[in-house]
């Protein structure tokens, strides 16, 4: 298998609105990100995935783009973006842009032209019909919006301000590739592709994702843009299986570097139920089965996976699956060790490395997220109590991940000097912040730093086979094996003591949040014990 820089990299996701504010308006900005590059260099990450900073009316926090080649005012300007790229490069950090090409904003010049002039070439950049079918928007309600100017309906799988693009149109596709090359020429390190599995949709046949032309489009995109460069490309593919992931990420197919698959995230809610019907208790045996499947069926050389617990759309993993009380630090380290020592490229979401948690939202006034607000409205209309609705939002709503980054114990956690930040700062910021983490040599931060360094220095993390070991339900243990080397990873994913029924001869400890020698000797794992050892 040809090795690429991203096989040994760890990527850090930044949600710009919430990372660092330098102009006191309560909203993060590009200068704020640049000001924190030394911190990210200390952590050791090789790339930043930057959530959208393009010109946008911010209906969906930047995932509604009005101009792909301009920066939205609240984040700064193109000079700030160029400076971020330059300063990041000086520190050995690449910038991965968020590519949102399933849809644009309804304020994009293409859509304005399409609406004003039904006979224009831009009209065919979007999807129109006379009689809508029953397709539904992911944000609730119909996926079709009536446009009185032309007496037709346009398709929007997200908000009505996010009309879907028509990838059947070759001129549109070329314009997208030209835009990608604009950013590649600026020196970016790659693209994270938002809901990329939806670009091959056929609405008339109710085909939303994994449409028949999807992979042809990606091959064309690869050849026309990033294929000539050593860039990281990752597709957001909610419905992917290992077989589908191979189509995207097998190097011989010339599509993407890797995928984000979400099968493990599905354990956050009841099977076949909407995400709001959350399950607080992690089904560890099911998690083992899912990770085992992805580690063994997406074979080395035939595809590549991403490893993540958190992103801007998901609740904080500590709040849903970890422990936010007595074992907060220990469970955060355990979940990190469990994930980062598998095969794949790990992604850290801002604040994960210091153990940030969900926000205790009291009412809808504290929310910004369009998805949560739409859910609340729909659920309340359908007879759910506001208490039940808020309970779901507190556990699973997208704003949990989007509260401001907690830098120190000063006003607004050091994020902003504004009287009011765009989302409230989590009240636990005086205890959970970067400054405190850096001062404590035993903090979660240094476990992440160690895991990132291990990946850079050890080929076995890329090459070694994966073998899930039979253990008690709440114990997740696996071997990584390559040539004569054996590495044992053990994690107690629970608040209880567990029995470890493995006899091994330890050679050395690579990383631990516990006294692993004691655990191996008496076969007892304390709550949230986690370690990786080299064995004979």
From Swiss-Prot:
The record marks 313 as: Transition state stabilizer. InterPro entries: Glyco_hydro_13_cat_dom (IPR006047), Glyco_hydro_b (IPR013780), Glycoside_hydrolase_SF (IPR017853), O16G_dom_2 (IPR045857). Its main location: cytoplasm. It is found in: Cytoplasm. CDD domains: AmyAc_SI_OligoGlu_DGase (cd11333). GO terms for molecular function: alpha-amylase activity; glucan 1,6-alpha-glucosidase activity. It catalyses: Hydrolysis of (1->6)-alpha-D-glucosidic linkages in (1->6)-alpha-D-glucans and derived oligosaccharides. SUPFAM superfamilies: (Trans)glycosidases, Glycosyl hydrolase domain. Gene3D superfamilies: Glycosidases, Golgi alpha-mannosidase II, Oligo-1,6-glucosidase, Domain 2. SMART domains: Aamy. GO terms for biological process: oligosaccharide catabolic process. Its EC number is 3.2.1.70. Keywords: Cytoplasm, Glycosidase, Hydrolase. The active site is at residues 194, 236. NCBIfam families: PRK10933.1 (NF008183). Belongs to the glycosyl hydrolase 13 family. The physiological substrates may be short isomaltosaccharides. This is Glucan 1,6-alpha-glucosidase. It comes from Streptococcus mutans serotype c (strain ATCC 700610 / UA159). The lineage of its organism: Bacteria, Bacillati, Bacillota, Bacilli, Lactobacillales.
């Amino acid at each position: 298998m040809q090795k690429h820089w991203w096989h040994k990299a760890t990527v850090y996701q930044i949600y710009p609105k919430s990372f660092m504010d330098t102009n006191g308006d309560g909203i993060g900005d590009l200068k704020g990100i640049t000001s924190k590059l030394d911190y990210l260099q200390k952590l050791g990450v090789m790339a930043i995935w930057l959530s959208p900073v393009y010109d946008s009316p911010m209906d969906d926090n930047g995932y509604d783009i009005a101009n792909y080649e301009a920066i939205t005012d609240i984040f700064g300007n193109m000079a700030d973006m160029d400076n971020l790229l330059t300063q990041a490069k000086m520190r050995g950090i690449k910038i991965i842009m968020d590519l949102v090409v399933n849809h644009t904003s309804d304020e994009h010049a293409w859509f304005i032209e399409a609406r004003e002039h039904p006979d224009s070439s831009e009209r065919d950049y979007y999807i129109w019909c006379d009689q809508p079918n029953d397709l539904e928007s992911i944000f609730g309600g119909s996926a079709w919006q009536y446009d009185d100017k032309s007496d037709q309906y346009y398709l929007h799988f997200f908000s009505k301000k996010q009309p879907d693009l028509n990838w059947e149109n070759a001129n549109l596709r070329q314009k997208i590739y030209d835009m990608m090359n604009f950013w590649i020429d600026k020196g970016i390190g790659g693209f994270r592709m938002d809901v990329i599995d939806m670009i091959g949709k056929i609405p008339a046949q109710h085909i939303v994702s994994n449409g028949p032309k999807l992979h042809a489009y990606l091959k064309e995109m690869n050849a026309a843009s990033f294929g000539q460069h050593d860039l990281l490309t990752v597709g957001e593919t909610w419905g992917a299986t290992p077989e589908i992931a191979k189509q995207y990420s097998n190097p011989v197919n010339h599509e993407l570097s890797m995928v984000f698959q979400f099968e493990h995230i599905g354990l956050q809610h009841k099977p076949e139920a909407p995400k709001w019907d959350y399950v607080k208790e992690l089904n560890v045996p099911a998690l083992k089965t899912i990770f085992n499947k992805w580690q063994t069926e997406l074979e080395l050389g035939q595809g590549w996976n991403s490893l993540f617990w958190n992103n801007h759309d998901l609740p904080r993993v500590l709040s849903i699956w970890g422990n936010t009380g007595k074992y907060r630090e220990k469970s955060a380290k355990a979940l990190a060790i469990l994930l980062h020592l598998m095969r794949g490229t790990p992604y850290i979401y801002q604040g994960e490395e210091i153990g940030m948690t969900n926000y205790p939202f009291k009412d809808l006034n504290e929310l910004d997220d369009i998805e949560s607000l739409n859910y609340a409205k729909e659920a309340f209309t359908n007879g759910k109590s506001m208490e039940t609705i808020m309970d779901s939002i507190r556990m699973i709503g997208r704003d949990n991940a989007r509260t401001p980054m907690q830098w120190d114990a000063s006003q607004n956690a050091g994020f902003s000097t504004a009287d009011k930040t765009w989302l409230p700062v989590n009240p636990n910021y005086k205890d959970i912040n970067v400054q405190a983490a850096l001062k404590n040599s035993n903090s979660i931060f240094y476990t992440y730093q160690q895991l990132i360094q291990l990946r850079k220095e050890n080929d076995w993390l890329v090459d070694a086979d994966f073998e899930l070991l039979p253990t008690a339900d709440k114990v997740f243990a696996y071997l990584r094996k390559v040539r004569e080397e054996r590495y044992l990873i053990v994690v107690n994913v629970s608040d209880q003591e567990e029995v470890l029924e493995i006899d091994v001869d330890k050679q050395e400890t690579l990383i631990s949040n516990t006294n692993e020698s004691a655990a191996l000797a008496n076969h007892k794992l304390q709550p949230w014990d986690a370690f990786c050892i080299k064995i004979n």
